[in-house]
Amino acid sequence: MVSMQISLSLVGLLDGSNGGSAVDATVKNLAQLRDEGFRRVWMAQLPYDPDLLTILACAFHEVDTIQVGSGVLPIQVQHPTQLAQRALTLNAIAGGRFSLGIGMSHRMVTEQMWGISYEKPLRRMREYLDGLLPLLAGQAADAVGETVTTRGALQIPGAPTPDVYIAALGPQMLRLAGRRTAGTLTWMTGPKTLAEHVGPTLREAAAEAGRPETAVRVAASLPVAVTDDIAAARARAAEEFAIYGQLPSYRAMLDREGYAGPEDAAIIGDENTVSERLDELAAAGVDEFAAVTFDPSPEGRARTRALLLTRDK
């Protein structure tokens, strides 16, 4: 059996739907998942939620051991210097347990909500890394770009450098991730696409840059429900994740896989069925699988987490 780390991707903690504060909910959930045996979780920064890194600063101070990654932070709304400053400060609090996932968000968000052009995404990400990566490594940045310029250095002694992941799906962004970062974070991407497109593109770029294949990782995320009511779970997945079938970047991944919608990408079934689907992902070259549990009942989510823990390698 090919080894694959199992993590969780948490959604809904920051939006107030839990009925309490986002900080309290995050601390409670991270402590529970740590005690259950999970080593890492990923948390998204949605455009209308409270600030993820601020909440994680509180949570890391209260909860030990467990690792947390941002999955992902959009780069357009903060300068590389500001993000490096925040990420290093957070990782100092976390004692090196933080991973920084960044991405381009989506045109409908950047242009309609923020009034920021989505043009030249590859150039924007490359120039952003030109400033961000030296600063995270404790070096001075001197990067003059068309979309962003970063100069200067930070003084945050003792802060560990966080791993940086890109939410890379297209070939050029995957190549950039392979050359310069710890890897890619994928969503709504199935095993065939991961095996034939994502993994090879990422690792070939790493090799061309003189990096070992082990320097980059594929961290894939999909909805998961261990259940005996497959029809109900598929209907819920189709409704809850409908927006992702409409966003161009994820729609392209669903089309590559031959999926009609997010309900086809979701991993649904009893313990044996879900375990077989996880085997497919591991065989496809996935290094880490971050599950989004979406069963509406606490019992159903607990059943799913129990199965996931048996698969963590």
PLM features: residue spans?
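Active-site-adjacent structural elements that line small-molecule/cofactor binding pockets in enzymes
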Residues: M1-K313
